Amino acid sequence: MKRVLLAEDDPDTATAIKTALEERLPITVDHVTNGALVLDQILATHPDLVILDVSMPGLNGIDVFDLLRGSPSLVDVPVLFLTAMPDLARQASARFGISDVMAKPFDCDALAQRVDDMLARVAKVA
């Protein structure tokens, strides 16, 4: 079973995302509430995909992404950004090579499709 790590500080949004993805796809979603916990969780669970909220307390999603890309063992982890600031995320995507960006609010079916597509791309590369 595929594993996804969700970094989202809003508990209602996190619950909605986790429920929507696990109901629609054969995946397990692990959740952390802030950017500082992401790296430890990645090392502990080895997710197939990381979903990052851009605006989190402590380390924001862009900071976390920068740390991921700076670590040789984590550089290839695919990342999906969720943001209420799509222009900022698109700029970061172009600058840092972010795998994908999705604007909030989003449709749960569209999110599940995007996650499924990204996981399929990862499977083809592996």
Identify the function of each model-found stretch:
Residues H31-L49:
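Acidic, metal-coordinating helix/loop segments flanking the phosphotransfer/catalytic sites
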Residues P11-D30:
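Two-component/phosphorelay signaling modules centered on CheY-like receiver
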Residues F106-D117:
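C-terminal output helix
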Residues D53, T83:
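Active-site residues of response regulator receiver
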Residues K18, D63, M85-M102, Q113:
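Alpha4 helix (beta4-alpha4-beta5 surface) of REC/receiver domains from two-component response regulators
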Residues M56:
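Receiver (REC) domain active-site loop signature in two-component systems and cognate sites
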Residues N34, N60-D66:
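Acidic catalytic/metal-coordinating carboxylates
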Residues E8:
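Conserved acidic carboxylate
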